[in-house]
Structures are given as C-alpha cells and as structure tokens.
Amino acid sequence: MAAKDVVFGDAARAKMVEGVNILANAVKVTLGPKGRNVVLERSFGGPTVTKDGVSVAKEIELKDKLQNMGAQMVKEVASKTSDNAGDGTTTATVLAQSIVREGMKFVAAGMNPMDLKRGIDKAVGAAVEELKKISKPTTTSKEIAQVGAISANSDASIGERIAEAMDKVGKEGVITVEDGKSLADELEVVEGMQFDRGYLSPYFINNPEKQVVALDNPFVLLFDKKISNIRDLLPVLEQVAKAGRPLLIIAEDVEGEALATLVVNNIRGILKTAAVKAPGFGDRRKAMLEDIAILTGGTVIAEEVGLTLEKATLNDLGQAKRIEIGKENTIIIDGAGDAAGIEGRVKQIRAQIEEATSDYDREKLQERVAKLAGGVAVIKVGAATEVEMKEKKARVEDALHATRAAVEEGIVPGGGVALLRARAAISALQGDNADQNAGIKIVLRAMEEPLRQIVLNAGEEASVVVAKVIEGKGNYGYNAASGEYGDLVEMGVLDPTKVTRTALQNAASVASLMLTTDCAVAETPKEESAPAMPGGMGGMGGMEGMM
C-alpha cells in the first residue's frame, strides 16, 4: 500500500479551498447570457468550445492531491445538479464557492463548524420553501420556449423548437436530439408507436420507392414465442384472408417454413402479410408486447394464459389504421385500443418508474409511457462545422432538460432574482446561537452571488445592479442580455424552479461537508528519480599496443 500524506485543520481546508476556487473560477465565466466561452483541449481532433458549466467542470483534474479533492467535491455539485435537474450547474458551482469562501472566514475566526452547518441547513430549508411559494406553473407554449431559450444561452430558435416538439408529442412525449444534415435545425415527429425492429424479409416490401411495407387497416397478431411451423398459423391466416385485410405478425421470431409461406402468399397476392420480431429482450419483450396489445386492442397469444396459435381467432388480433415497416423501425399509427385501457397501462408504468432504482430502467419505462401516450419527436441540430454541432447539441440537451424541469415544478423569475427574493424568508430567521446565525448569514450572502456573476460577465458593476434589484419587488430584475431593468417574467427571463432549488440544495450540501472537514488523507506523490547515465566506453585503454 502506498504511503499517505495526512494533513489536519486549516492547512487541509486551505488547500481544498484553492482547488474549489480554481474549478469554480473556470466554470463561472460561462454564467448568464453574456457568459464567456471556455476552450477544452482534446487528445484527438480539434479543441471543443463550450459555454456549458458541467462540461468545463468534468475536464478539470488538478496535479496537487489536496487541491484536487476540493475541485472534485465542487465537480460533484455540478454533476449532481445536472443529473437531477439537467441544468443549473454553473449556478450551483457559484453558490458552493461562495458558501465555502464565506464559511472558511468564520471557521478561521474560531466558530464551531457543526453549528455553521446547522445554520446553513436551516437557511436553505427556508429558502426552498420560499422558492416554492414564488413558483408559478408553466401553462403556455411561449413560457416553455422562453425557458428553453434561456437555458440554451439565450438562443430563441432552440427554445421554439423544443416548445413545438412538446406541443406535438405532449409534455410526457419522448424528445430526442440528433445530428442534423443541414445548417438549420429541424423537427421530425413520429406519430403513434415506434419500435426498433424492421421487416424479416425484403420480399414483404410493397412500396419500393420508400423501401417500406405499408399496411392499411391491418390485423396484428402478437405471439411471444418463435413461429417456424406454418400449420400452427393456418387457421388464423384463413380467417384473415376471408376478412380481406392485411396482417402483421409480431413474434419472438418467424423462420423457416412459416416465413417462406408468408413470403410466397405475399408475392402471389393471396394474402398481404408482413412479419417483424418483437421489440426488447426477456421480460421487457413481454411487457412491450403487452403495450402493443393494449394499443391495438388485441391479446398477446401466450401459453401462460392458455392461448395457442391454432385456436386464435380474429377477436384475439389487434387492429390499427396504418402500419409502416422499414428496414429498422416499425410504426403503428392509430391503434384500435381502448383509451381507458391505454390510460390504465400508462398509470401502471408510471408507478413502476417511481419504484425503479436504475437510471437505465427508468429511461426505458419513460420511453414506453411516451410511446403509449403521445409519440416521439426528434430535434435534428444543424450547424456549419462539427465543433459548432457538438456545442449546439449540448445546449439543446440542456434546454430540453430545463423545459422538462419547468413543466414538472413550475418557473421562477430568472437572472438570479428568484434567489434574491427568497432571501426575504431567511432574513428574519434566528438560529439557536451566534454560530448558527453566522451560518444563516453565509447563505444570505451566497444567494446574491449568481446575480453578481451574471452582471460581472456582462461587464457591468455588480454592487450597483444588486442594490437596485434588491430595492425592487417581485419579478423586477436586471436583464443582462439587453442591459435593461424590468419585469423579468414579461421579458421572458425565466428559470425552472427545480433547477434553482436543486442548485441551492446541492451547493449547500457539499460546501457544508467541506467546512466540517478537519483532516485530509492523500497519497504521497512519488518522486521520480533521474534515470541512470548510460555506460561509457571504458576498457579501451590498451589500444596503443595494437599500433
């Protein structure tokens, strides 16, 4: 085991604070509409230019072990805020730096760090309650567009695209971000349910121009096992042929004789059919088959429920208005399922989302809800160069998270004003002793910091602007983009409540940990000894005798 350096008290804290300041100073220049860019070196390819706080934070690794500990703790604030709320990483970093900086002064003056922490926690609790009171629900598409624009560093077109996508697929719908092919941003909406399985044979294609299988008003057969024997399928095929409608078979697999017979029937025009594999794997496959059954008003034919292929009737089959099958995707449009049944299924999946422990499971369940409830929207980001594309895509993703957060918990005035207004609830707070009161003061001072930084980045005098905004009431604040004072909500400068709340809570949590740290243990840096000199040309002394 490597030897360790153990550092106590002020010496440990001072080094960690240096690390906090290095990271926070690099991140906070990106805050606000006039935030500056940060250039990140890449080991391959060109450098990346970003205004995204968490991207900057993730790049920073310091040589000094103790400084690095401080930096990593603040990086945790940014990452945690990004994971929970999807935005607000720079605000959280600025708040954490301020709480650490002010707190260290009181610790150095001999105050009890544990009481300071209690005071900080008390103040943050009161501020969060006040933020909830200030918060208003997002109701209009315009508000959603404004939140998106602010989060995308004041890019109105991104906000509008996201609002448009939410209008099309609903607030629960899946919205994904992809690289576009042109210079302009595009929005593509897939109505109905889409899953990532294509046709099993190209011979099913009936629209050669688009290279897709298009089935109008088809029946849908759902089976949870492989189909290889055509005899099992014959009774159903005969009933469908009599009805004179197309058939889509969704099963674990369709192979051999069964697939060959379907293809031959299709080519001869006896029965218009297509077959695709069921989406997902294992238990998720069963759940998704059940989703499709509810959407199309059919039944999954499974031995567990006592149903077999030979005994299946038209009543067991689902129906849809139209189904399109490409090489890699199948889209079911306007399934014949019962609205109440679909709503019940959505509620059931939402309950599973609440209980899900892994992010992957939660994401997959949310996709299932969206597929049942609305549809899928794809925002294709356009840019002139790859560097610009990466930077813009990161901003669109941030904006998307922010708008989701706004829909979830509502909005507050942006530009650092919500935190200033929430100070009203703290100013009258009293702790149990003088040290706790000092903790409350630390938070009061920190809550001015985001506005100060926004103003500094805009090149104005912070103290003057903060004093003027404090004099105002409600939504009155400073719009750094235009340099004007006024009602920020009317100007469209909005922040999601969830983002502001999460930033404050995470910043206070990590900063309190740092204030109550009294010892740091780090690996002793290895001293690299200089390599030995190469051997000389010794032993050549007896050469005279050879002359």
Curated annotation (Swiss-Prot):
Enzyme Commission number(s): 5.6.1.7
Swiss-Prot/TrEMBL catalytic activity: ATP + H2O + a folded polypeptide = ADP + phosphate + an unfolded polypeptide
UniProt cross-references to InterPro entries, sorted A to Z: Chaperonin_Cpn60_CS, Cpn60/GroEL, Cpn60/GroEL/TCP-1, GroEL-like_apical_dom_sf, GROEL-like_equatorial_sf, TCP-1-like_intermed_sf
Entry's Gene Ontology cellular component terms: cytoplasm
GO process annotations (BP): protein refolding
One Gene Ontology molecular-function label: ATP binding
Intracellular or extracellular location(s): Cytoplasm
CDD domains: GroEL
Recorded family membership: Belongs to the chaperonin (HSP60) family.
SUBUNIT field: Forms a cylinder of 14 subunits composed of two heptameric rings stacked back-to-back. Interacts with the co-chaperonin GroES.
Function: Together with its co-chaperonin GroES, plays an essential role in assisting protein folding. The GroEL-GroES system forms a nano-cage that allows encapsulation of the non-native substrate proteins and provides a physical environment optimized to promote and accelerate protein folding.
Name listed for the protein in its UniProt record: Chaperonin GroEL
Natural source organism: Cupriavidus taiwanensis (strain DSM 17343 / BCRC 17206 / CCUG 44338 / CIP 107171 / LMG 19424 / R1)
